[in-house]
UniProtKB/Swiss-Prot annotation:
NCBIfam families: PRK05205.1-2 (NF003546), PRK05205.1-4 (NF003548), PRK05205.1-5 (NF003549). Gene3D superfamilies: 3.40.50.2020. HAMAP family: PyrR. Keywords: Glycosyltransferase, RNA-binding, Transcription, Transcription regulation, Transcription termination, Transferase. GO terms for molecular function: RNA binding; uracil phosphoribosyltransferase activity. This is Bifunctional protein PyrR. A motif (PRPP-binding) lies at residues 98-110. Belongs to the purine/pyrimidine phosphoribosyltransferase family. PyrR subfamily. Regulates transcriptional attenuation of the pyrimidine nucleotide (pyr) operon by binding in a uridine-dependent manner to specific sites on pyr mRNA. This disrupts an antiterminator hairpin in the RNA and favors formation of a downstream transcription terminator, leading to a reduced expression of downstream genes. Also displays a weak uracil phosphoribosyltransferase activity which is not physiologically significant. Its EC number is 2.4.2.9. Homodimer and homohexamer; in equilibrium. InterPro entries: PRibTrfase_dom, PRTase-like, PyrR, PyrR_bifunctional.
Length: 175
């Protein structure tokens, strides 16, 4: 199966920069702003957005990760749920503006699971959603506030995001 490159390294960098600016505009700066990336690639994108915001405003926004494993509805639930916080960040996110970051928005189920993970232990003032790619085909009424690129796809196509931190290249491809 051949791959079609939709975004190369330069396009991803420009998109991360634009999303960082949009988040700052949305929040009117960095006050009370928290970035939470969904493991795995969303966490790396969150770090990149954090770095861009720091370049723009010279403030390091608190950034963490969300592990949605225990909140997914497509896996058989275990009887003994783990009773520990499913996100990792060094600050309290209650009454903060939390931006959840993912690589690809598809059915909306990953985002729903991330909302469950956050809301189980905290009550943010506001939650926003940023995604590098929105490919459509939603199964839940979820919409991103910050979208890098809308890529209409067929359901049988796969959209893959490759990030240098784990994939040794930066690209968004349709396979």
């Amino acid at each position: 199966m051949s791959e079609r490159i939709i975004m190369d390294e330069a396009a991803i960098q420009r998109t991360v920069t634009r999303i960082a600016h949009e988040i700052l505009e949305y929040n009117k700066g960095t006050d009370n702003l928290i970035l939470l990336g969904i493991k795995t690639r969303g966490a790396f994108l969150a770090r990149r957005i954090q770095q861009k915001i720091e370049q723009i405003d010279e403030i390091a926004v608190p950034t963490g990760t969300i592990d949605i494993t225990q909140f997914r509805d497509d896996l058989e639930q275990t009887i003994n749920q783990v009773d520990e916080r499913s996100y990792e960040i060094d600050v309290n996110i209650t009454n903060q503006v939390v931006i959840i970051i993912d690589d690809v928005l598809y059915t909306g189920r990953t985002v729903r699971a991330s909302l469950d993970a956050v809301l189980q232990y905290a009550r943010p003032k506001k939650i926003g959603l940023a995604t590098l790619v929105d490919r459509g085909h939603r199964e839940l009424p979820i919409r991103a506030d910050f979208v890098g690129k809308n890529i209409p796809t067929a359901k049988e196509e796969d959209v893959s995001v490759y990030l240098e931190e784990i994939d040794e290249r930066n690209a968004v491809v349709i396979e």
